[in-house]
Swiss-Prot record:
Amino acids binding L-glutamine: Y59, G363, L391, G392, M393, Q394, E414, R471
Protein role: Catalyzes the ATP-dependent amination of UTP to CTP with either L-glutamine or ammonia as the source of nitrogen. Regulates intracellular CTP levels through interactions with the four ribonucleotide triphosphates.
Record keywords, A-Z: ATP-binding, Glutamine amidotransferase, Ligase, Magnesium, Metal-binding, Nucleotide-binding, Pyrimidine biosynthesis
Domain Glutamine amidotransferase type-1: 299-543
Gene: pyrG
Coiled-coil annotated spans: none
Name under which the protein is recorded: CTP synthase
PROSITE patterns named among the record's database cross-references: GATASE_TYPE_1
Lineage: Bacteria, Pseudomonadati, Chlorobiota, Chlorobiia, Chlorobiales
Binding site for ATP: S19, L20, G21, K22, G23, I24, D76
Sequence segments annotated as region (Amidoligase domain): 1-272
Residues that hold Mg(2+) according to the record: D76, E146
Amino acid sequence: MARPKNVKHIFVTGGVISSLGKGILSASLGMLLKSRGLKVAIQKYDPYINVDPGTMSPYQHGEVYVTDDGAETDLDLGHYERFLDESTTQSSNLTMGRVYKSVIDKERRGEYLGATVQVVPHVIDEIKDRMAEQAKNGDLDVLITEIGGTIGDIESLPFLEAMRQMKLEMGDSNLLNIHLTFVPYIKAASELKTKPTQHSVKMLLGVGIQPDILVCRSEKPLSREIKNKVGHFCNVNELDVIGLNDCDTIYEVPLMLLKEKLDLRVLKKLGLKKYKEPTLDYWRDFCNKVKFPQDGEVTIGICGKYTEYPDAYKSIIESFIHAGASNNVKVNVKLLRAEDAELNAFDFAKELEGINGILVAPGFGDRGIEGKIKYIQYAREHNVPFLGICLGMQCASIEFARNVCGLQDANSTEFNKRTRFPVIDLMAHQKKVKEKGGTMRLGSYPCIISEGSKAYAVYHKFLINERHRHRYEFNNAYRKNFEESGMVFSGTSPNGELVEIIELKNHRWFVAVQFHPELKSRVQKVHPVFHGFVAAAKEYAHGVHQMDLVVEMPSLVPVLTEPTQ
């Protein structure tokens, strides 16, 4: 019997303040290790008590990232997929709520044999068991675990205790901690201050963990003197104090960490000797295209309900960066608050001045719906490139029904259960569902595309797989009416029952999709829908008026390939 592979573990923690970029750090390190020939996986441990973020407000949590297997997860998993070009799964995101639920379920089944169930050992052992199971997946060399929250938060203590025990059991050469901290720059003193980092490390020491590597976020580069000071007071080798100053784009972070030799320090500490030199020319080319676009810029308006919190649209915004690079343009994003468009005095021409394309974003509930519909009407009537995603497709259907098909009171039963013309209705298998968490149509599903459509022009294939997160769907009772009025149903489920893509033939670019293309766009594989949309916006900005744009996929950033099911 073959001996199990000795998987190396890297835990990434954060201190001083939140939002330092632990997810970007984890994804960047994973990408560097993968480029050296190692098999790497990343997971996120979130300390909140929710089982998953699926029922959390976007204002509190940001975007819910959906995996191929239907998990509703943290948005950091999007960074992992975009940087590593590897798909995550249900097991890639563990919440404290899921841990507690599992422990309580086991207690109810009598699996603890009458013991008093406690955080130590039962909750901690549950975390360690989950970690051991994840390490068995995929013949891994390295498993990176990002622990959410900030050192000092009471919620994350069980995760830290599990890490402490694992390090003791596995040894320093099999598990290391990378601690991300903040070194503020005080303008009045013209100095970088290390004291917050020192205190953060002391808090980590207070739970029994000595960090192996410190990554210090800062506004300005760290001098050798500062690195030496941090290392001296935090009991870390100066070579293991890594500077990470602000940069123009998050996609430069791997290149900065490579320059700081973070990956080499990790390899040495974990005793990993068989590796190759990384080839990152494609990554440098991508960053150059992002920073120095050759064909100017375009501006896309994102009409949504959560525009005060851009993280609610994180993957959409990142997808525009990818599509901008593939089209050699910079994509500026303007967030458009849907509710504002419902005001009688709202001036669309003024609000959309300089806008080269309109995207109506996903969401739930009736707030701002009429504003979204008005933006869609403007895009349709003024031949402005338009893309609707999920709820955006449903709103596009409502707008078309009202203003083209003559169904004046058309609506979705989500917003008006008594509407005379329910062009959007609850899916049949959803009508008896009572619980909200994890019960939508979630994950990757196949879609058949019609030849000769705009969708086929960007995908160049008949069968695609895309990720979904919805309960409502187009009502097929109205399909004939729509088709007679000029709507093209260019993508459906294989049995033809579920509408996945709609588009207008006599429009520059009017495409709406029920799925979430933003969840599958990556640095090396720009999503075809976003590439095509930005290409249309680019032509619109340049004053080209042909109706059927020829969209060529780029050579630098290849088209999304068929995923493995």
